Amino acid sequence: MASQDYDVVIKDGLIFDGTGSPRRRGDVAISDGKIVAMGRIDASSATSVIDASGMHIAPGFVDLHTHYDAQVFWDPYCTLSGWHGITSVAIGNCGFGFAPVAEDMREYAMKSMTRVEAIPYESMKQGMPWDWVTFSEYLDSLDRTPKAINILPYVPAGPMLTEVLGLADAKAGRMPTNDEHARLAQMLNESMDAGGCGWSAQRLPPTGPAAVQRDWDGTPMPTDMMND
């Protein structure tokens, strides 16, 4: 390529290209935000040069199990993940999350996440804009939030069960009626159409050997009690 055809050249790093090929020392050229060449590249062909001597060059890692659902609103790097080469995180794991959450259930949602994921209550209260009710509106709020990391949002089953059955009935494990089942299915379909990458649930029945994670008041989480 002609001179100055690259925006950035990362020089002399140990390249792990993500294909399973052996690591190799070399350079990586980037143009328009995309990798366009690897190998030995003339540094004069780039607008900017990064010396990666003694460092590794690798694709961004994906953290499939996180609970940055709230933290992303005040921490664009989703630390600590963003400090360790992770460029994409999945949120909404374990059936926990903040959408759909009606206004009168916000307090419960924050208390619950304080208990099960040790997210400071005051951080959530002050850091989240709470400008949503539905999952689609939550994703819109995420889109408006400056971020330095990609977000893969699971649709958490807990808030859907709470929304449709009510908190007490969801925790009691009541079987949804046909109409409620249809509403749950519609809610999930709409959430997936809005951008959900999947759905999640925690299954730790209170009588089972793994019954270690309870809600803020000591009762089971809604998805622990849901019917198959």
What kind of region is each of these model predictions?
Residues A2-V8, L14-G60:
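Histidine-rich, glycine-flanked metal-binding segment
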Residues G13, V28, G33, G54, ...:
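Divalent metal-coordination and catalytic microenvironments
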Residues V49, P100-M105, A211-R214:
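Short secondary-structure transition/capping segments
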Residues H56-L80:
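Di-metal (Zn2+ and/or Mg2+/Mn2+) metal-binding site signature of metallo-dependent hydrolases
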Residues H67, P156-G158, L204:
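Active-site beta-loop-alpha junctions enriched in small/polar residues
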Residues D69-Q71, F96-A99, R203-A210:
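Active-site environment of divalent metal-dependent phosphoester hydrolases
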Residues W74-A185, N189-W199:
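Divalent-metal coordination cores built from histidine and acidic residues
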Residues A194-D228:
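Active-site core of metal-dependent hydrolases
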